[in-house]
Design a protein with these regions (language model features):
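Active-site beta->alpha loop and helix N-cap motifs at the rims of alpha/beta catalytic domains
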Residues: 2-147
Length: 147
């Protein structure tokens, strides 16, 4: 059966293992994503999500997570990379990095500052900025960030 929708099947959220000094444990990450991607029924992985420390990792570390995941999972494993930034410019930079590093799709998180105030034009502008720099499919993360 051929699937038109690349998001079919199970997509598992992964963690980003950290060392005691708070640096990314690249070997543990490679082992983790490799193991999770090979579980029966898994079609894809979410990397750089909340459990993937996307609030904590630097931009370079987020890019590195995508690179390590891409090198550690089967080519058929769909990688969706989380994008989480307060600034639309930084979110766009993360999107470009993720695409270049081998992500297949992006999950764009809302800026936390929207908890204070946001309107429809802000939401549209932020996501349009990210969409404008990448050819990847984008999933919008819904979170309660205010009214």
């Amino acid at each position: 059966m051929t699937h038109q929708n690349p998001f079919y099947g199970i997509h598992a959220a992964t963690v980003a293992p950290m060392r005691p000094d708070f640096s990314l444990d690249e070997a543990a990450l490679a082992s983790h994503v490799s193991a999770v991607s090979r579980v029966a029924g898994i079609r894809g992985l979410l990397i750089n999500g909340h459990a993937g420390e996307n609030f904590y990792l630097t931009r370079d570390e987020m890019r590195r997570v995508v690179e390590i995941a891409r090198a550690s999972v089967p080519a058929t494993c769909w990688l969706t990379a989380g994008i989480n930034a307060e600034s639309s410019i930084e979110a766009a930079r993360q999107a470009v990095d993720a695409e270049k590093a081998g992500a297949n799709a992006l999950l764009v998180f809302p800026p936390n500052s929207w908890a204070l105030h946001h309107d429809a034009s802000m939401v549209e502008a932020h996501h349009s900025h990210v969409i404008g720099v990448t050819s990847l499919p984008i999933v919008l993360y819904q979170a309660p960030v205010g009214d």
